[in-house]
């Protein structure tokens, strides 16, 4: 399964859509698909669907990977209209206006945070021991909130070692953005994954500093 190719193809597609200034970076899509694969994710919650870039990539990936139960929140009228047109498998999204509307008995393998949501605190009810959280981009405020909700969480930044491609909406002189990986209830295997990412990020920063 070539998730990198899927990420590139979806990023190219969404770069031509109205509202593209708010889509996830190409490298963030690669990270999300890799995490989905590595942690054998079957149930996802995306907080802030936007115009649908992330969900479209994941559902495209699911054609090879296997069925994924996808929940998402969005309450912006423009985004809600765009989702219907942009996401190939739109009918597979279980759509909610905000996190507080989701049954607290639901538990998610993967929670993707890609926007602001005043009801973010409700993720405390929706995470369990196997949950992985990814916050797209920098979003330091949201990282701090999530770590406050999960006092034992461990967090590592996932960064790229290449700049934005010229076929996207973001400046090609800037690094392709990644995101923040958080394990709210870190197991031993999660801690190992964390340290591997920590080392990878360190090496990429060294490479960046040489350019």
Feature annotation, model-predicted:
Residues 103-110:
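A short acidic, Gly/Pro-enriched loop at the edge of an enzyme's catalytic core
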Residues 14-18:
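Short glycine/proline- and acidic residue-enriched helix-loop micro-motifs
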Residues 19-102:
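SAM cofactor-binding core of SAM-dependent methyltransferases
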Residues 74-78, 115, 138:
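Short beta->alpha hinge that forms the Motif I/post-I loop of the SAM-binding pocket
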Residues 117-211:
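C-terminal substrate-binding/active-site "lid" region of AdoMet-derived donor-dependent transferases
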Residues 42, 109, 131:
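Conserved acidic residues
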Residues 89-96, 110, 128-129, 150-155:
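Active-site regions of enzymes building and remodeling cell-envelope glycoconjugates
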Residues 1-13:
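N-terminal, positively charged/glycine-rich alpha-helical extensions of SAM-dependent methyltransferases
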């Amino acid at each position: 399964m070539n998730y990198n190719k899927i990420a590139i193809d979806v990023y190219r597609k969404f770069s031509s859509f109205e509202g593209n200034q708010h889509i996830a970076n190409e490298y963030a899509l690669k990270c999300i698909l890799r995490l989905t694969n590595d942690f054998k994710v079957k149930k996802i919650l995306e907080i802030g669907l936007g115009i649908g870039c992330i969900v479209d990539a994941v559902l495209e990936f699911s054609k090879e990977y296997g069925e994924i139960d996808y929940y998402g929140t969005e309450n912006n009228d423009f985004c809600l209209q765009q989702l219907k047109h942009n996401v190939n498998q739109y009918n597979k999204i279980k759509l909610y206006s905000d996190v507080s509307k989701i049954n607290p008995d639901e538990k998610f393998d993967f929670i993707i945070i890609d926007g602001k949501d005043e009801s973010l605190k409700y993720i405390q009810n929706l995470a369990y021991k196997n949950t992985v959280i990814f916050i797209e981009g920098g979003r330091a405020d949201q990282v701090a909130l999530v770590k406050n909700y999960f006092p034992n969480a461990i967090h590592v930044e996932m960064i790229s070692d290449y700049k934005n491609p010229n076929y996207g909406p973001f400046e090609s002189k800037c690094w392709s953005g990644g995101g923040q990986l958080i394990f709210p209830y870190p197991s031993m295997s999660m801690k190992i994954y964390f340290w591997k990412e920590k080392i990878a990020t360190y090496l990429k920063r060294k490479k960046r500093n040489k350019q």
